[in-house]
Each structure stands twice: as C-alpha cells, then as structure tokens.
Amino acid sequence: MNGFFLVNKPEKMTSHDVVFQIKKKFHFDKVGHTGTLDPLASGLLIICVGKATKLAFLFDKLPKTYQGTFLFNKHYDTLDVTGKLLDTKNTPLTDCNIQKSFASFHQKKYLQIPPMFSAVKIKGKKMYRLARKNQVVDIPPREVFIHHFEKTSLFCRDQVDFLAHVSKGTYIRSLARDLALQLNTYGALLRLQRTAIGTHLLQNAKTIENLELNDLILDSTFFAAYDELILNDYLIKLVKNGTHLDQRQITTKKPFIVKDSNKNFVAYYDTLDENKYYPRYFF
C-alpha cells in the first residue's frame, strides 16, 4: 500500500518514534515523514507509506500553522524550555508593547537565523551535533515569510499565547527569540501545536492508537484533483521507462498525472523547463 496518514503526534515523542510505531503497528516495510516536529511539540505529522515515501517533497514547500505559548525573560540554549537555562531577565512587559512586537512580524518577510539546536546542516554536519560539542559556528540566515502572527491571550506570568501561519523553513523557536529581542529581553517556546500543513488539518488526524489501515490516504486519491494526461499504450511504455514529455503531448506550467487508456494512474510529472516535463513518481 502506498499513501499517507495524518497523525496527531503527542508531546515528548520524536517524529522518528511515530514512524517506528506506525511501521510496527501495520507491519509496513517503508515508512517516513514529511517534516520533523520537535519532541516538545504536538500536532499534525504527515506520515508516508510505501512508495509514497518518495513524495515527501510535495509537502516541503507548504506553509504551516501553529498555536502555542511563548515564555519571556528566560534564555535557553535550545530556545525552548527543554534546554539548558542560560540566563534570566526581569524586563517589565505589557500587553501593549507585546502586541506591537507581534504586529511588526505580521505579514512580514525577514531573514531568520535558525536555532543552533536544529537539523540544519553546516558543511554537511547537523547543527545540533555541533551544539552538543559546544562548537560555535556562523549560522546563515534564511528568508522566511510570516503570513499571520497573532497574540491570542493576555500577557500573564511572562507568558502569552499565539497563532502563527508561516512559510516553509520558519522556526517558531527563532520567532520567539526575535519577538522578544524587539522587547529587549529573552524569548523561548513553552508549548507548540501544529494545526495545519497546507490544506491538511489537525482536526482530520488521528492518534497512533486510534489509527486504522483504512485511514491511509492512497497516493492516487491524493492526486485526484491534479490535471491528467491520457496516453496510448506506446507512449505509456516510454513513460514507464522514464521518458521526458514535451509540448507534443501537453502544454502546461503545472504538475500533472499521466494515465493509460483505461485511466489507471501511471506517473506524476513535474515541469523541468518551458514545455518540458519529467517523471518524479510512478504509481
């Protein structure tokens, strides 16, 4: 079977733990995920099964939505409360100035520096491994976009709740740090829940315990809304051998599905160049 599960990951469990448990529960040979969710965080994790593990790239560019809680005036090495507390401040804060800081990031594109404790690679080495060895490196910033950033509670006991809808590659831990910097203090992540990946919603996800085999979204079902190209038997043989297609078969700027004359799914094609297309996945 090839497809996807929408899983509600609990706190204190790694994304790898979820993969392992699903593999064990259903006796699948190949299982993967489309993007790590930190152990501190709960919420939506998309799990790929079978050949669909090769489709993780489809989710990479999707925006993500989170809700959670920031903690101010405390500095942790990991930028969340699971790390080592390095320093504290007693900076007086108000709802008014916190709201102004939130507003300054709303619908904003900016260069964000990922946390040192992250899976980002520097010269082929994951930064969290360097951090554990106390190795200091220059971390290149990456451009991110904050589509929506909202304070959802009153400030109380150095804490405030938030809602964030962000682009690919955005670290909420870094956002906590950067929000607090504008307030001349420290910021860390206290709680985090991922509620959406693109149009895939947490409300449609299940816990590992409640997950059933018929919850698997088949790869063919996932592509049901894509444009399709139906080819004859001769061209289908070429497609199965990895042949590129061009304007002689189709003209489009979007990915599409190739089907045979019986409307069976054969391959997923993506754009390579203008009027040139290549296969990225075979059903």
From Swiss-Prot:
Q: Which UniProt keywords apply?
A: Isomerase, tRNA processing
Pfam families (UniProt xref): TruB_N
Query: Active site annotated at which positions?
Result: 38
EC number of the protein: 5.4.99.25
Q: What does this protein do?
A: Responsible for synthesis of pseudouridine from uracil-55 in the psi GC loop of transfer RNAs.
Name the Gene Ontology molecular function terms of this record.
RNA binding; tRNA pseudouridine(55) synthase activity
UniProt-listed CDD domains: PseudoU_synth_EcTruB
PANTHER family hit by this protein: PSEUDOURIDYLATE SYNTHASE TRUB1, TRNA-PSEUDOURIDINE SYNTHASE
GO BP of this protein: mRNA pseudouridine synthesis; tRNA pseudouridine synthesis
**Native organism taxonomy:** Bacteria, Bacillati, Mycoplasmatota, Mollicutes, Acholeplasmatales
The record's similarity note reads: Belongs to the pseudouridine synthase TruB family. Type 1 subfamily.
- List, alphabetically, the InterPro entries matched: PsdUridine_synth_cat_dom_sf, PsdUridine_synth_N, tRNA_psdUridine_synth_TruB
Q: Which reaction does it catalyse?
A: uridine(55) in tRNA = pseudouridine(55) in tRNA
Protein name (record): tRNA pseudouridine synthase B
